[in-house]
Each structure stands twice: as C-alpha cells, then as structure tokens.
Amino acid sequence: MGRMKDRNASAGPEVKPAGLSPSRFVKVFMHGEPFERKINLAIHNNYDSLSFTLKRLGNNYSMSPFELEGFVNNEEDGAIDNDFDLLYDDMNGVRYLLGEVPWEVFTITVKRIYIVPAEQQNESEYQEEEEDNAAAAATADEDVDGNHWWRNHLWSVGPILQ
C-alpha cells in the first residue's frame, strides 16, 4: 500500500525575510551600566524615531522593561535635550555613528547599539570598557563549535550592501 501525503503537512518551516519580521530586537548597551537592554527596531521607521527613543532610554536606563514598553515618540513627555552619542556595531564588528548608513542597510546589519555620554572624549577608553560587554555577548552568538550564527546568513545581506 502506498502512503498518501497529508495535504496539510508543510514541506518545511516557513521562512520570513529579515525585513518583514514583526519584531527585530537589538541589544542596547549604556556606557557604565553592567547590563544591556533590548529595543525593537520594527516599531521605528527612521533614525529620528530611533534616536529619540534611545536618548530617552539613556536618561531612564534603570527603568524596568515594563515601564519602557511602548517608549516611542511621545511628544507629551517634552523635548529631550541630552548629550549622548549613539553608536552601533554591524555584523562584522565595525562601529559606526548612528545615521552613517541608509536606514534600510542599518536595520539589516545592526548587531549592537551603544549609548555613550558625549563628554566621553577618548573612544579607545570607551572601547576597552565595552570589550568586556562585547566579549560576553559574542559568546552568546556562537554555537557549540564556536561559529557565529550570522556567517551562514551573509548571503541574504550581500546583494543589498553592494
């Protein structure tokens, strides 16, 4: 007797393109803080919205995740006037200022975001302090063989960056 295929069974897991995901969480590190936060890039359409949220987060980094939920452009809270520089690392570990590349490229390649006080003049001093955080986070991104998860997925980003 031959076996009939179940019409409802799928051939494999459904894969969504990275840009269409309903959520895209990225780790955010604040200079001098021992822990990181995560922010959902999917709720932001541009750098202005993201910068506004990150600067508010910089002022309120110790708030609980529940208090930060929905922490988007809310004009009722007033303008934010603070001195934070916003940096990020891409998948290759290259550090950029937020806004240096087109938004679409940023959303695909960003791996970590850093909120740094603007008075921090010596970037190498900052980088030494953040290496501990980055080393701890990098081990979380490796599989049991020590391979980075994104190395197998670079083909999906390549054509966009060219």
From Swiss-Prot:
GO terms for biological process: auxin-activated signaling pathway; regulation of DNA-templated transcription. Its main location: nucleus. The keyword Repeat does not apply. GO terms for cellular component: nucleus. Pfam families: AUX_IAA. Coiled coil: none annotated. It is found in: Nucleus. Gene3D superfamilies: Phosphatidylinositol 3-kinase Catalytic Subunit, Chain A, domain 1. Residues 23-118 form the PB1 domain. Residues 122-141 are annotated as: Disordered. Keywords: Auxin signaling pathway, Nucleus, Repressor, Transcription, Transcription regulation. Homodimers and heterodimers. Belongs to the Aux/IAA family. Lacks the EAR-like motif (domain I) which is conserved in the Aux/IAA family. This is Putative auxin-responsive protein IAA28. It comes from Oryza sativa subsp. japonica (Rice). The gene is IAA28.
